[in-house]
């Protein structure tokens, strides 16, 4: 049987997964909600549901890799602002459950690694990437190697304080870039403005509890000239 590999992007809103063959071609994909507000074991259960939905009898699962937001140390999630994992042994639990090697890294670092190895950054010795989603992450390649610093979070610009008296961030600080310009923050700003009587094309979406605006919605409304969207996005 041919070896197959599973890659996961574990975010604060959703978990994306893909099954790859030995040549790195995608065989199939899967997506589940993270359910990040329901506790660490519920999140792990969602991760396992994605993995189980991807497994294929035509090949042998050889390894699992995952990118997770936050501070990672040897496969343990020391802290993740957008998930309820704290000092959580994710790598160990995946190995125990699936009996294959598992590799866990900071999501921005592993995303940049993919861009550097296979995308527009291929061949570059030095590269910086920033990623905006539920939070804001960043990765750095220096002299052909991922530069993570002592805790693996050297590129984490999302937790740079840019407005000292700003909104409370998931990390516990105030005024982090993530608390001002992530999709979660942008959604909160929209909600606040709508509650004050401002008009936007997102009013129906924002009426759904816990809804986070999608990038495609923001882009469409921005190019369409939604005045509140243009104002909020330019500020972010």
Task: Locate the predicted segments by residue.
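Short glycine-rich, Thr/Ser-proximal phosphate-binding strand/loop in the N-terminal lobe
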Residues: 2-45, 76-77, 152
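Short beta-strand segments
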Residues: 9, 65-69, 105, 129-135, ...
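Glycine-rich phosphate-binding loop plus the immediately following alpha-helix
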Residues: 15, 104-108, 162-200
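Residue-level signal for inorganic ion chemistry
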Residues: 17, 66, 94, 186
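Adenine-nucleotide phosphate-binding core of ATP-dependent small-molecule kinases
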Residues: 30-31, 35-59, 177-179, 187-236
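Glycine-rich phosphate-binding loop and adjoining helix at the ATP-binding site
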Residues: 36, 40-48, 52, 59-64, ...
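Glycine-rich phosphate-binding loop of actin/hexokinase-like ATP-binding domains
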Residues: 120-180
């Amino acid at each position: 049987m041919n070896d197959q590999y599973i890659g996961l992007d574990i975010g604060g809103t959703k978990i994306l997964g893909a099954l790859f063959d030995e040549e790195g071609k995608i065989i199939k994909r899967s997506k589940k909600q993270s359910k990040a507000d329901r506790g660490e074991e519920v999140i792990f259960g969602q991760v396992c549901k994605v993995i189980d939905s991807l497994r294929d009898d035509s090949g042998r699962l050889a390894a699992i890799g995952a990118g997770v937001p936050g501070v990672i140390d040897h496969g343990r999630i020391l802290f993740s602002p957008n998930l309820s994992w704290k000092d959580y042994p994710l790598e160990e639990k995946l190995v125990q459950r699936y009996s294959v090697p598992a590799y866990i890294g900071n999501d921005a670092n592993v995303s940049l690694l993919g861009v550097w190895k296979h995308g527009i950054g291929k061949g570059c010795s030095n590269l910086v990437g920033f990623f905006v989603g539920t939070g804001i992450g960043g990765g750095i390649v220096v002299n052909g190697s991922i530069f993570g610093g002592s805790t693996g979070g050297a590129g984490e610009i999302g937790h740079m304080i840019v407005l000292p008296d700003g909104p409370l961030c998931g990390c516990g600080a105030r005024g982090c870039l993530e608390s001002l310009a992530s999709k979660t923050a942008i959604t909160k700003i929209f909600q606040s403005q709508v509650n004050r009587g401002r008009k936007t094309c997102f009013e129906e979406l924002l009426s759904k509890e816990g809804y986070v605006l999608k990038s495609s919605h923001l882009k469409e409304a921005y190019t369409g000239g939604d005045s509140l969207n243009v104002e909020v996005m330019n500020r972010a």
